[in-house]
Amino acid sequence: EANCAEYPETGHPPMTIPEWKEMLLKYRSYGINFVRFHSHCEPEAAFAAADELGMLLQPELSHWDPKDAFGTEESYRYYRAELVDLLKTYANHPSFVMLTLGNELQAQDEGRERMRELVRTAKRMDPTRLYANGSNAFYGEEGCDPESDFYTSQSCKDVVIRGTFSGMRGYLNENYPSADRTYDEAMAEIRKEYQKPVFSFEVGQFEVLPDFEELESFHGISDPVNLKLIKKRVEERGLLPT
């Protein structure tokens, strides 16, 4: 996941193919072949580089965690125009394989219908790709959307498909680490009502102690206040590695 288009040195994403090839090759070195652009769409150089390297990309509309997604006519028109432009702009890139309407969207009745209509619009324009109403839409509480081509979430209603949650919940926090935990039972339950691809959402969200030496790497426009605060608290508790 390329989280939130955060580029601390420049404040904007790389704009050239060589820069993107360098970044994507780093992903590949970690065994990654699929990149989700969290609530944003990167510039065309990203898609061109991914085409050359055989990487797969999932852009998203720039919509994140509202309580009433697409609830107004103005927002619906705006995001529909964004969707149409995105599909027209990137349609010829084979690396562009999936798309969602945004991150952790929630909506009221009218917004829900507009979410369905946006997915239908995308399918009509270009049926060669996979579309979904969101990544972790409704935080998984409403289950799989039957009109979406795939489902990405932390859970499907009360069926958990992620190892850790906020508040120190999840089996990674509650049980001794082991490699014998699978999601077979969870998927068997989901398959009773949904047969399309299922992805677990943001599985790497667990607490680790930061590498505070990275503070010396910030030379651009960003001030890593969060890391500085964490370091201060770690020092106060006598936990700073020596």
Tell where the protein language model's regions lie, with residue ranges.
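Conserved, mostly hydrophobic/aromatic
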Residues: 50, 99, 122, 131, ...
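Aromatic- and acidic-residue-enriched segments that line the glycan-binding/catalytic groove
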Residues: 47-58, 70-84, 114, 120, ...
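Active-site flanking residues adjacent to catalytic metal/cofactor-binding acidic residues
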Residues: 59, 103, 201
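Active-site-adjacent substrate/metal-binding segments within catalytic domains
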Residues: 1-66, 72-98, 112, 235-242
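Solvent-exposed loop/turn segments at secondary-structure junctions
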Residues: 41-43, 63-66, 103-107, 137-139, ...
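Polar, glycine-rich mid-to-C-terminal structural blocks
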Residues: 111-187
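Substrate-binding clefts and catalytic carboxylate motifs of secreted carbohydrate-active enzymes
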Residues: 99, 163-242
